[in-house]
């Protein structure tokens, strides 16, 4: 009896979502255990990921979707950093206790930084380079970035 007939994950592709610093993938947690449990050699992933993200500033948190096939081969898509991370860095928001930049506690009343429309446009261009967002108009992406900025306490100035 095959694994699929027994109810195992025999013929199904599995997806693992990770956030890894650009150029900083290593077999240690969180990468190693997440991929090891699916039967993937984490060192192979780390070498390929670090090669693909070599042109990006080291440490930039990159969302990754790893698709694991039933034969234990894999492929992965590296996505653009989260919009909030890009905005907080552009606004040079203060660094919180955990060593990460943090948005406002009360976004309507508190402001942690400001960005210009040029920053918004550049962030929208970065996001548009992602395959799933490539069909959206740049104006719509700019509006989404502006709304995201307001929701984390960043003012947008013309």
Swiss-Prot record:
Keywords attached to this entry: Mitochondrion, Ribonucleoprotein, Ribosomal protein
The subcellular location is:
Mitochondrion
Q: Which GO terms describe its cellular component?
A: mitochondrial large ribosomal subunit
Family annotation (InterPro entries): Ribosomal_uL11, Ribosomal_uL11_bac-typ, Ribosomal_uL11_C, Ribosomal_uL11_C_sf, Ribosomal_uL11_N, Ribosomal_uL11_N_sf
GO BP annotations listed: translation
Q: Which CDD domains match?
A: Ribosomal_L11
As one GO molecular function, the record gives: structural constituent of ribosome
**Is Mitochondrion there in the keyword field?**
yes
Q: Which SUPFAM superfamilies match?
A: Ribosomal L11/L12e N-terminal domain (SSF54747), Ribosomal protein L11, C-terminal domain (SSF46906)
Q: Name one Pfam family in it.
A: Ribosomal_L11_N
* NCBIfam families from the UniProt entry: L11_bact
**Quaternary structure annotation from Swiss-Prot or TrEMBL:** Component of the mitochondrial large ribosomal subunit (mt-LSU). Mature N.crassa 74S mitochondrial ribosomes consist of a small (37S) and a large (54S) subunit. The 37S small subunit contains a 16S ribosomal RNA (16S mt-rRNA) and 32 different proteins. The 54S large subunit contains a 23S rRNA (23S mt-rRNA) and 42 different proteins.
Q: Explain the purpose of this protein.
A: Component of the mitochondrial ribosome (mitoribosome), a dedicated translation machinery responsible for the synthesis of mitochondrial genome-encoded proteins, including at least some of the essential transmembrane subunits of the mitochondrial respiratory chain. The mitoribosomes are attached to the mitochondrial inner membrane and translation products are cotranslationally integrated into the membrane.
Query: Could you tell me which PANTHER family the record lists for this protein?
Result: 60S RIBOSOMAL PROTEIN L12, LARGE RIBOSOMAL SUBUNIT PROTEIN UL11M
Name used for this protein in its record: Large ribosomal subunit protein uL11m
Q: Which species is listed as the source?
A: Neurospora crassa (strain ATCC 24698 / 74-OR23-1A / CBS 708.71 / DSM 1257 / FGSC 987)
């Amino acid at each position: 009896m095959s694994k699929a007939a027994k109810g195992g994950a025999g013929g199904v592709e599995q997806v693992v979502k990770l956030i890894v610093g650009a150029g900083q993938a290593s077999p240690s947690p969180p990468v190693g255990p997440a991929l090891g449990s699916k039967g993937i050699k984490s060192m192979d992933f780390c070498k390929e990921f670090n090669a693909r993200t070599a042109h990006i500033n080291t440490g930039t948190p990159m969302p990754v979707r790893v698709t694991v096939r039933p034969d234990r081969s894999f492929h992965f898509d590296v996505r653009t950093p989260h919009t909030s991370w890009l905005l907080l860095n552009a606004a040079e928001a203060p660094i919180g206790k955990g060593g990460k930049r943090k948005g406002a506690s009360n976004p309507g009343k508190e402001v942690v930084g400001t960005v210009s429309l040029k920053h918004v446009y550049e962030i929208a261009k970065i996001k548009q380079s992602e395959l799933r967002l490539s069909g959206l108009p740049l104006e719509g992406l700019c509006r989404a970035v502006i709304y995201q900025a307001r929701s984390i306490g960043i003012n947008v100035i013309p």
